[in-house]
């Protein structure tokens, strides 16, 4: 992979960082010193939980905070300050009430620009989670709405939290299609207000960030018609710190990132249990947490600051600047990877290898219905039995066969997951459209029905048209599964 010149300048040897940290650490702070650390979190933004609520509930930050050298006998006062969106966190950082914050890509740009403009500089020090193609942000409509794709929203009243990652996604969607800003009647509404207004039919659609484009359909009153994966541009959530705090207490920033890395490992080690705990702590349903952070999840947990993420942030800034939505911002010096590099080094991890990796947590295991292992994770599925475990399946057809088999046994399906054939993101099976049927190379019907899931109705229609199948609902796809499928 070719690394841009500015990214190469970030590749500071870990040894130099350690020397710098040790030199900075000379001289104790004093036995009576109390270091106050304000951490701005977004508990209900599911792809940030390993940077916030998980650290808080498992005590991981306390585990790694430095207590030797200049920090000997120092006391720490942690203030966890939660918000449902990024602007209050940026305000808190500008007021120096929050020293460490987490937010999505477009809010990160606003945070960095505001800091530079007000002389309260921040720095991007780590990533929490990403989707390399933009998945996670989305637009939903009422479940019984006649709208099925973005083009249907022309002239309609659509809400989104202004300044959010979802807002950025919607701006990008218009630019990609050459559409003007007044294509729709766009208004700013928080997730809570937008959700209520959608249920009460006061708006035609609502755009939002993680987890709302999955959460609202899961709760039964919405349907997703657009996912950020359609932009094919990365989306991410990252960690920013006040620059003065990082300069004064670099060891604390490194400790935070080490805690983040352990939280990521905890989430991956037993994703079902982790999702259940996150539901307990945040009230976001475990099945929704799992679709983002479990195997095959929409987002990948990885703190490394990859060159392609920097390129994406530069493109985000350019898009906002063209629309005069953000002030001048010098992005390159705002990115500081020395802390995450040092955290990797202290944990014995290979940062350079992680920079090159886009590996997530693929679906794997043995399919109990079709009696074969999962060989192609991008075509696999999963079923979460209510009160039970999560079972992998080798294909969408085998997953739906599993739904029928488990239901026949009297087991209640908490959630079934399939992979979108076009966008590559995980879907709730009952929210997908399906192309079923199909013909072989000789034009004859296949011996067993092909069942291919899609988020978007028009993608399913196109696939069915091109492969001699038909568009089907979830119920129709279930009915098409033969009882002897193995």
Region spans (language model):
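Short, low-complexity disordered leader/linker segments with a strong preference
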Residues: 1-35, 358
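Short cysteine-rich clusters marking metal-coordination/redox-active sites
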Residues: 367-370
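Short, glycine-/small- and polar/acidic-enriched structural segments
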Residues: 29-180, 185-188, 204, 233
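Conserved C-terminal helix/tail region of periplasmic/extracytoplasmic solute-binding proteins
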Residues: 321-363
